[in-house]
Amino acid sequence: MSEQGITVSKSEDFSEWYSQVLSKAGLVDLRYNVQGFVVHKPWLMRIIKAIYRFFEEELEKTGHEPVLFPLVIPEENFEKEKEHVEGFKPEVFWVTQAGDEKLERRLALRPTSETAFYYMYSYWIQSWRDLPLKLYQSVSVYRNEKNTRPLIRGREFLWIEAHDAFATHEEALNQIREDMENSRKVIWEKLGIPFLFLRRPPWDKFSGAEDTYAADTIMPDGRVLQISSTHDLGQRFAKAFNVTFLDKDGKRKYVWQTCYGPGIWRITAALIAIHGDDKGLVLPMNVAPIQVVIVPIYYKESDKERVLEKCRKLEAMIREAGYRVYLDAREEYTPGWKFNDWELKGVPVRLEVGVREVETGTVTVFRRDLRVKEKVADSELISHIRKLENDILEELKRRAKEFFESRIVTATRREEVEEALRSGKMVKMPFCGREECADDLKEATDGGKVRGTEIDFKEGDYGRCAWCGAPARLIVYVAKSY
């Protein structure tokens, strides 16, 4: 990996391409000496902070307040909801010792925080006046994953978790709709990542939930990646933690609850993978740590100062207009090296300024997404950049949507399902609804999973199950996943 640029094609070897981009674009360092724990470098963290900001803004617009709960959760909290503990206990990291002394009770590093939040909700919620309660935290969580991949599956990963409580189930279901809309506003509208929100089958729902609704996107290798989810918890946790309220008639009732988890890590992975190309990252301007880079070009010492003077004026003008701009005046690198480096890092707009640009009052503008150049007059530069801000995002959305739709196929027969999964497609098919059939499909296709139905799907007669031939009552999506 000593070469400057990416040495493989994304379409031919996505796994190696992804590894090279993470390393060569300066996103992560995997040399930290604990497996599954990743060092996040500045370029990556600036992208992640922007994504966090988008979600936090949407959450707070819809009435959520930020909180921060302790990292550790006592074991007795976990034990309160049987299905939840059975689902998560195999992955939990336990703190059992402090200094040389063994702790009297084990403390879990949070794998998720229902059992921390709802312990406190039993104190905070007493009356109908305390509802709805809508809180979120932006944190790392910890799970002992066996097979790790940076930003996709790790033992420590970044996310947001929102935990909401309501007086009625109808309000909780409305919250799930709101969660899905918040996901759409950020993941699709701001980041250009297409996805399907699917209602997971009963055997694949979140541990302790009545229903799970999850957003799946399709990666370049055809595997799907769950990037966000929202869960109808019903009253299970309310009963386990005795979260009750007095209603307006003086009757004590259990609250209805939801939880929502945008996977910041995985959304970032999808952003990198879906928009990137064989030159490296391709970033929308709204998340790019540097939105505009200026590269001076001169070959004679006598031209240096007038070229740099123009570059400095452009830098000040662009910064004044509100953009993150960097003048790359490093003398130890050639302009060509700088071009490759900033393309690798995904900077959306590059300005090239040489003697000709100084003399003609123009700038050569390079668009990272299309890899095209055009001449723009100095006087029109800011309006041109403002237009590019939208144009680049719309182009990324167009390409991503085109790819996403091309990877979904319909099948009605077993061999069609097998062939589609072999070729990296997501399959839409009639399904009998039986877990045994889903298990057989997964085993026979080396990992093809029933991902679920569309959100408003109604059961009915849909002919024969494409896999087993039994009467089909559902139309489901099937794919291999990470």
Swiss-Prot record:
Keywords: Aminoacyl-tRNA synthetase, ATP-binding, Cytoplasm, Ligase, Nucleotide-binding, Protein biosynthesis. GO terms for cellular component: aminoacyl-tRNA synthetase multienzyme complex; cytoplasm. It catalyses: tRNA(Pro) + L-proline + ATP = L-prolyl-tRNA(Pro) + AMP + diphosphate. SUPFAM superfamilies: C-terminal domain of ProRS, Class II aaRS ABD-related, Class II aaRS and biotin synthetases. It is an enzyme of class 6 (ligase). GO terms for biological process: prolyl-tRNA aminoacylation. InterPro entries: aa-tRNA-synt_IIb, aa-tRNA-synth_II, aa-tRNA-synth_II/BPL/LPL, Anticodon-bd, Anticodon-bd_dom_sf, Pro-tRNA-ligase_IIa, Pro-tRNA-ligase_IIa_arc-type, Pro-tRNA_ligase_II_C. Pfam families: HGTP_anticodon, ProRS-C_1, tRNA-synt_2b. It is found in: Cytoplasm. It comes from the Archaea. GO terms for molecular function: ATP binding; proline-tRNA ligase activity. Its EC number is 6.1.1.15. Homodimer. Belongs to the class-II aminoacyl-tRNA synthetase family. ProS type 3 subfamily. Catalyzes the attachment of proline to tRNA(Pro) in a two-step reaction: proline is first activated by ATP to form Pro-AMP and then transferred to the acceptor end of tRNA(Pro). Consists of three domains: the N-terminal catalytic domain, the anticodon-binding domain and the C-terminal extension. This is Proline--tRNA ligase. It comes from Thermofilum pendens (strain DSM 2475 / Hrk 5). The lineage of its organism: Archaea, Thermoproteota, Thermoprotei, Thermofilales, Thermofilaceae. The gene is proS.
